[in-house]
Amino acid sequence: MAAAPEAPATPKRPLVAIIDSGIARTPELSKFLVAEYDFGATPARAAFQPRYDHGTMVATIMEREAKAPIDIVSFRIDDLQGCPDDANPPCQHDVRPIAEAIRKATALGVTAINISLNLKEDPRIVDAVRDAAARGIKVVMAAGNDGLDHPGNLGMARAGYPNTILVGALDASGQPWKGTNKPQADATGYRYAWQWGVDVPTIMADGSQAVATGTSFAVPIETAKLLTEPKPATIALSS
């Protein structure tokens, strides 16, 4: 008697790392969150209980934009000391937690890393991004909200090219938001994408409705889009 054919394997969901302020386990996100690592405090703070809304808002936008179910692993990096009065959370004065979060995400073999932060051009972060991108991981980063004619996070974008992407924000009419750091006239050596980033509907950590503006909130839309692309081949690192 012939054996019955085996049922096809269930496709594995894309695993996405969100390096941010931590993510709340809201009813909408609960079935997508698989783990949270706290690189901003020792001992680690309680998982999925963020101080700030930012990471939850980013994760919600990404989940809504994804064409198929995804798994999200949260990397919480916000400083225990909070933010200066003139800064928007999440803040982290030390580059080490951010670099370590990128390396942990790389070790987990995630499909993409979402970084809706304005990072310091520190060699530890640049090297961590380069290594992630060399392993075929898409690293998607905010271009920044300073209204400049060049993007932030540029060193990282060049280091991981072509698997790193900077994202600027468009308004609902498709025009660049006034606060976006725009690509240079000659954008050779890095990728820059535009996505909706003005008054984007989302959810705060307490589950309440909100709208969000800034390149931070354009990034998860681009990340979700890139999840449908084939994973690129790894890149040989030069010695």
Task: Kindly give the residue locations of the regions a language model identified.
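Active-site core segment of subtilase-fold serine proteases
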Residues: 2-93, 97-100, 104-108, 112, ...
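Structural recognition of the beta-strand scaffold that forms the well-ordered cores
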Residues: 15-19, 71-76, 111-116, 138-142, ...
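Glycine-rich, phosphate-binding/catalytic loops in enzymes
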Residues: 28, 32-37, 129-133, 156-159, ...
